[in-house]
Every structure is written in structure tokens, then in C-alpha cells.
């Protein structure tokens, strides 16, 4: 299972920008073919770190699908005309296959289901939410990704999926409250918390080089460091801290 390793995988194929936009529903997007000063083309992915970690992880998998042009592959192999709506469905399915592989998921689902099933092999809505939250923890993906995967692999009906996602007779706020309780009761502290991360890979090093070169004003560099929470003094102080380790010749 990839879990949050997908964030590092994404880093290999593009420059990832993390920044919190609290009033923005967009979880992320990508921009391709941006030239640098030498004309080399680069791809950038923005991830909204005001979203929860599990949403950031699924967003990373989604954007990886765009970078790998999975939609174009499907279009060519299946001889389809792929519009925007279908394109997003293809990429979402790719992200689900990447983050929640079928064989592993089905075994995990079986184990979790058997823990809470009734003697007649049925399950209550409350216990189904327990199964979903435990699977969220195993795969580190959002609730909706698990629910949709359950439906895709014929574990639950469309009606049950709609019910859990707040499109049935039970209000979504009641479902969300119960899910939150299960998360807290199990100590799944990573969930439902935004990271508010401000970071661009290798950006701190580039700012240091720009600072030393004198090509960018000190004020502008300071402003950028503040924007991305890069504190030069703290970084330098940490690098200069002696480590509590023994040398190779210690007896």
C-alpha cells in the first residue's frame, strides 16, 4: 500500500507546491510545460494543504494520473472520445486503483467486516461506518474513496453508498459526526486534520542560492520565506546543533 508515500512518488515527476487556501474547495491542480530560464519544461502540482491529509494524499494520486496521462491511454486503447467529465472519472478510478488495490482491499474488507457482522452475516449502518473508518486508516484515503471502492467492487449497493455519502434519508452531518467519533475512539489522529503545510521541494536551497548571488533583494527573499514559513535562522541553527551520537572510534 502506498499510503502517504504517494506524496514522495509525486515529487519524482514534478515540482509540488503545498499551500493552504482555506476558502477554496479545489483540492489541487497541475500545470504542465512551464519553461525555466534555460527553456526546459517543467510540471507543477499544487496541493491545497488546508484540506485534510487523507484528501491531500488522494489528490496527489489523482494528479499523478494526469501527469502519466492515464486518460489518454484509456482514450487510445478503448477508442473513446474522452470529454472533461469522463476524463476526471478515469483519473479518479486510476487514483483508487493506485491507492486501494483490489486484492489487498478485498482481503482487508473481509477481515474488518467479519469483526462486526451479526450472526446472520448482515451489518448495521453504524458498524459499516466502523469498517469504513478502519479501511480509511489502513489505506490513508478519504471516506468517499473507500465508499466508492466498496461500491465498485460490489461490497455495497448504490443505495448504501448514497446513504453513507449523505444522499439518502440520513443527514450527512449525522454520518459525519459518527465517523468523527469512530476516528477519535480509535486514536486515528492523522485524520480530518489539515496540515496547512507551506512548502516547495528544494525551494529553501534555491532561496539560499538567490540570497548569496544578490540577484534578488533581501526584502523579497524575506517575504517569500515568511510566506512559505522558511526561517533561515532556525534552519541554520538546527544544522549546527551537535548530535548525541558516538563516533566510529568510541569504545
Residues of each region from the PLM?
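Active-site hotspot residues in diverse enzymes, especially metal/ion-binding acidic/histidine motifs
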Residues: 1-251
Amino acid at each position: 500500500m502506498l499510503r502517504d508515500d504517494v506524496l514522495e512518488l509525486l515529487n519524482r515527476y514534478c515540482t509540488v507546491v503545498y499551500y493552504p487556501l482555506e476558502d477554496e474547495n479545489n483540492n489541487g491542480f497541475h500545470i504542465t510545460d512551464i519553461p525555466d530560464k534555460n527553456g526546459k519544461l517543467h510540471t507543477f502540482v499544487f496541493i491545497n494543504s488546508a484540506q485534510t491529509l487523507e484528501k491531500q494524499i488522494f489528490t496527489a494520486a489523482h494528479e499523478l494520473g494526469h501527469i502519466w496521462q492515464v486518460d489518454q491511454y484509456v482514450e487510445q486503447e478503448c477508442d473513446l472520445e474522452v470529454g472533461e467529465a469522463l476524463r476526471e472519472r478515469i483519473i479518479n478510478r486510476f487514483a483508487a486503483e493506485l491507492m486501494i488495490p483490489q486484492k489487498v482491499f478485498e482481503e482487508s474488507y473481509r477481515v474488518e467486516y467479519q469483526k462486526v457482522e451479526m450472526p446472520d452475516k448482515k451489518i448495521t449502518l453504524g458498524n459499516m461506518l466502523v469498517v469504513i473508518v478502519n479501511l480509511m486508516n489502513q489505506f490513508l484515503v478519504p471516506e468517499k474513496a473507500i465508499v466508492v471502492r466498496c461500491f465498485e467492487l460490489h461490497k455495497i449497493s448504490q443505495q448504501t453508498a448514497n446513504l453513507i455519502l449523505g444522499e439518502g434519508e440520513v443527514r450527512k452531518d449525522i454520518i459525519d459526526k459518527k465517523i468523527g467519533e469512530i476516528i477519535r475512539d480509535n486514536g486515528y489522529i492523522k485524520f480530518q486534520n489539515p496540515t496547512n503545510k507551506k512548502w516547495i521541494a528544494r525551494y529553501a536551497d534555491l532561496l539560499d542560492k538567490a540570497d548569496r548571488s544578490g540577484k534578488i533583494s533581501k526584502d523579497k527573499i524575506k517575504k517569500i520565506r515568511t510566506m512559505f514559513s522558511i526561517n533561515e535562522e532556525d534552519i541554520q541553527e538546527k544544522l549546527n546543533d551537535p548530535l548525541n551520537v558516538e563516533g566510529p572510534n568510541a569504545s
